[in-house]
Structures are given as C-alpha cells and as structure tokens.
C-alpha cells in the first residue's frame, strides 16, 4: 500500500514537472499569461471554466443558467459544459478571483491527469514502468492536444486511459465494485468532454465484446453483472448530462453529416505537427486539415508492438486485437462520412448528431498506438543488455517529441467601465455591436469581459444560437432606437455597453445622433474614445 502511494506521488510529480517544462512559463503566471489571447475559442474557454468555477459554489443549482443569451435558461448547455474543468479549477478561482488563473490551472492539470492515467494503463498492460512512462508521454503530450490548447474540453483526455484501465481490471476479476469504478470513470469523462465520452462509450462497448469472445467471458454471469453495474452507474451519474443533451436536441440543435465533411481528416493530418522535432515535415505537406501526427515513437513502436504482441502469448494478443482494431477503426472514422464508417455510426448511434468533427477520432489513433508502443518497449527492454540506458534514451526522445513552441501572451485587460459595471445594481446587459451570425464569434470577448461583473448578457456566443436572438439582433443593433428600446423593454434590459472601435466614422456619427435623440431614456455612466456605458432609465 505504502509503495503504491509512493509510486503514485512520484508519477504525479513527474508529470507535473514535465508539464511545467513543456508549458513554461505558464505555471508561474497563471493570472497574467494565456495561450493566444486573441483567440475567440480560447476566450470562450476562459469564460466557461470561470463560470462553472464560480457557480459551483455560489449557485450550484443554477450552474447551467450561464450569463449569456438572457433571458434564456440552461444556456451553458449550448456548448460543451466543461463541468469537470470548472470544478477542479474552482479552488483556484476562489483563491485568486481570476478567470485566467482558474482556466490555466485546469489546462495544466489536464496534462498531469492524462499522463498519470496513461501511465497506469500502460503499466498494467506492459508490466513495465519504464515502458509505461514512454507510452504516457507519447499520448498525454501528443501534437493534437497542443493544436487545441484554446479548447479546454479537448484537453480532457484522461478519461480514455482511466476508463480502459478500469475495464481491464473488471475483465481480470469481474466484481460489482470494479463495474462501479468503470461506470464512474466513464461518467467523469462525460462531464469532462462530451466528444471523448462518445469515444469512450464506443471503446468500452467494443472491449466488452472482444473480451467476451477472446476469453469466453460471454458465459460468465459475473462478467456480465459487472458490466451491467458499470453501465448502470455510468447512466445514473450522467443523467444531468443526458437531460441537457435532450433539451438541446429538442431546441433544434443537431449536426448533419453534410456539415461534418468540413472537419474530416486526410493523410496529411497524420503527418502534421507543430512540435519542434516534427515541424520540418509541414513544408512538405502544403496544407493540412488537422494535427494528428502520433509522433515518431508512436508510429514506429506502435507498429512493432502490434507485430511482436501478436506473436506473444494469449494475454498480449488480446491487447493487440483490442487496441489494434480500435486504432484502425478510429483512423477509418476520422476520414468522415464519405469513408463509410462514420456515416454508419452517425445513423445507428443517437449521440452522433451532437458531434461535428470526425477528425477528432484521430486522438483514439494516437491513444491506441501509444498503448502498442509501450508493449514494444517492454519487449525491447526485456531483451536488452542495457535496459536502463535504452529506457532513458527512449524517455529523452519522448520528452523531445513533446516540446513545442507556444505563443503565450499577456492576458487581456477589461475596460475600466466593466469595473464600474460590477459595482452597479444587477440587471441584464446589452453589448454592442451585436455582430451578425457570421461574426458571432467576436461576442466571446463580451463573455470574457463579463467575468468582471457576471451580470446577464443579452448577447452570447456558443455552438447553438437561439433562433429568437438572431430574430431580434437587427433591432438591437440599432441601439438606441425605438425598435431596440422596445425590444429591450420586454426583458427589462438595464445596461448597454457600446464598443466604439468597430464603428466606422459615419456609423459613429449616426450613433451619437441617436444617443442625443434618446437621451431622456438613457443615463450615461461612462464615456471615452473606446467605450460608452449607459443605464436605461425608461422606455419609449
């Protein structure tokens, strides 16, 4: 027991140190640095994590009622909920009061958790700690996750190895307790990232059938009882997520097969990487749709692991069958509906209508190859005359492949008017310009700035946009006007923030004329060359 605790502490500390090395200097500047500050998806992620981190303690029963698209409710469900990321970040948010610090902590923690989970999975399958370390680094720090640093949910990869580890433990000794552990791991992945929860569901479902066949477990009542317990626990724990998914689908949100064709992988994606040891290949690719290169170790040793594992004993062959098949199937699915498999899955699995990017199956390709690579490394070390040296060299190469140049910048400071707004009585806020649907992503900055006051916003940006918001956007965009104020009266919108920079000279002159015309209905709270802040004191 004590040895296991010591090993766990060393593993966590090791991956924390590697995370600090690869993502330096972010760990020492949680509140003042952020990756690619101007990226709108990144701004959305900062807001999302901070909202959950705050709401989980301040108003836990209203965590889904995010402060966007007022007066709609359950607006957090319009995109990834990020409940797991926000929950683990909540202590940091309350200690610092910084949305950036909360987000950055969750970002860093995702690498540590993923590395730890993959280490224990690879150790269980390869029976070699050194091989497990290399496999874990290859997966947790793969190029794909660095390409998606602005998307906090896509960094939450730990549920893949932890869920498969829980399954293997169940398969080795089926008990209700191990079934419950599997269900818990799968549910936690659902709270961390809906995309990956679908992957985990498919992977575990396939693993259950493969092991039932290869081991003859289909005749074992204990096996099916444990699997049933896992399914039941996973479903029960995921009920809130299921309800929100049904709510969103009933609201009209769904992804079409035609739309998914924009987000498919191609062969170039599996050679694309921005990591230092790989970036030279980009010049030969011309263009690429995704970043899915598994790394040199993953590709070479993954193939070796499949070959040597197939010739080994029954237990190792089981691993090759499971992870080799998962890798090939995920590769096939990542090419999208025109390749066939993705279209079949879309038609038979209801949750696929919530997915958009087939290319994200590429993460499962990296996952499977990393597992197989750890098998190859264990095989190599077992036959090596100098296993310590070989394992050290492999770890150095794995760390080298994890190194990537990252563009961290200073966090964006909110305009001082938002500080003033935070001191004012509560009330809905309209941010202008409203922006069209095409430019709706720019509203993510409004959401980020709202972390200084947390008042409800009429505006918003998310995967799903309420139809009535689009319908009223044109009227609101003319604020102040009779049509805008009449619309705002319905929801008792109290404040309006006007960002002047996007307005051209003629538009700004027209705006100022309307401000004078509707002055009896407005109280000007702040004015400078960048921003106007009004309180609506009455309506026409």
Predicted regions and their residues:
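Start-transfer (signal-anchor) and selected internal transmembrane alpha helices
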Residues: 1-24, 225-233, 307, 311-326
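Periplasmic/ER-lumenal interhelical loops and adjacent helix-loop junctions
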Residues: 36-55, 231, 239-308, 332, ...
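Membrane-interface transmembrane helices that cradle and orient dolichyl/undecaprenyl
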Residues: 163-179
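Membrane-interface coil-to-helix junctions
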Residues: 18-114, 138, 143-157, 261-284, ...
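Transmembrane-helix motifs of polytopic, lipid-linked glycan transferases
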Residues: 105-125, 371-375
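Extracytoplasmic
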Residues: 216, 396-540
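Transmembrane-helix signature of polytopic, membrane-embedded enzymes
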Residues: 118-141, 385-395
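Perimembrane helix-loop-helix junctions
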Residues: 169-171, 200-233, 306-315
């Amino acid at each position: 027991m004590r040895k296991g605790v010591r090993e766990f502490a060393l593993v966590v500390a090791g991956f924390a140190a590697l995370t600090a090395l690869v993502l330096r200097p972010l760990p020492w500047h949680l509140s003042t640095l952020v990756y690619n500050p101007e990226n709108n998806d990144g701004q959305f992620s900062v807001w999302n994590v901070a909202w959950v981190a705050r709401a989980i303690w301040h108003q836990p029963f209203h965590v889904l009622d995010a402060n966007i698209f007022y007066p709609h409710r359950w607006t957090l469900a319009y995109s990834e909920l990020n409940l797991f990321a926000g929950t683990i970040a909540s202590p940091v948010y309350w200690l610092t009061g910084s949305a950036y610090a909360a987000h950055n902590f969750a970002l860093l923690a995702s690498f540590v958790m993923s590395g730890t989970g993959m280490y224990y999975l690879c150790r269980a399958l390869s029976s070699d700690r050194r091989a497990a370390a290399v496999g874990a680094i290859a997966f947790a720090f793969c190029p794909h996750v660095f390409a998606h640093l602005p998307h906090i949910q896509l960094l939450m990869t730990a549920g893949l190895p932890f869920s498969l580890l829980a399954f293997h433990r169940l398969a080795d000794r089926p008990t209700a307790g191990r079934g419950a552990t599997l269900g818990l791991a799968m549910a936690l992945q659902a709270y961390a990232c809906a995309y990956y929860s679908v992957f985990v569901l498919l992977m575990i479902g396939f693993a259950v059938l493969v092991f039932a066949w290869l081991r003859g477990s289909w005749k074992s009542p204990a096996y099916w009882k444990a699997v049933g317990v896992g399914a039941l626990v996973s479903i029960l724990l995921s009920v809130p997520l299921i309800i929100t998914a049904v709510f969103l689908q009933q609201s009209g949100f769904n992804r079409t097969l035609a739309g998914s064709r924009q987000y498919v992988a191609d062969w170039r994606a599996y050679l694309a990487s921005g990591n230092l040891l790989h970036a030279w290949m980009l010049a030969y690719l011309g263009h690429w749709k995704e970043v899915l290169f598994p790394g040199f170790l993953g590709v070479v040793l993954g193939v070796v692991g499949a070959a040597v594992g197939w010739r080994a004993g029954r237990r190792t062959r089981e691993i090759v069958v499971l992870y080799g098949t998962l890798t090939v199937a995920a590769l096939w699915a990542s090419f999208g509906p025109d390749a066939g498999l993705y279209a079949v899955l879309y038609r038979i699995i209801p949750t696929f209508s919530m997915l958009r990017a087939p290319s994200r199956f590429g993460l499962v390709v990296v996952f499977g190859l990393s597992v197989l690579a750890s098998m190859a490394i264990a095989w190599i070390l077992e036959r090596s005359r100098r296993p310590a040296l070989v394992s050290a060299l492999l770890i150095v190469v794995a760390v080298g492949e994890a190194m990537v140049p990252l563009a961290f910048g200073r966090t964006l400071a909110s305009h001082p008017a938002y500080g003033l707004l935070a001191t004012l009585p509560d009330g809905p806020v309209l941010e202008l310009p409203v922006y069209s649907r095409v430019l709706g992503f720019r509203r993510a900055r409004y959401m980020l700035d709202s972390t200084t006051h947390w008042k409800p916003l009429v505006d918003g940006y998310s995967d799903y946009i309420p139809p009535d918001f689009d319908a009223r956007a044109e009227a609101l965009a003319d604020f102040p006007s009779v049509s805008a104020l009449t619309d705002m009266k319905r929801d008792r919108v109290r404040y309006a923030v006007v960002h002047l920079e996007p307005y051209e000279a003629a538009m700004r002159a027209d705006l100022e004329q309307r401000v004078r015309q509707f002055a009896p209905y407005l109280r000007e709270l702040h004015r400078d060359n960048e921003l106007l802040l009004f309180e609506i004191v009455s309506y026409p």
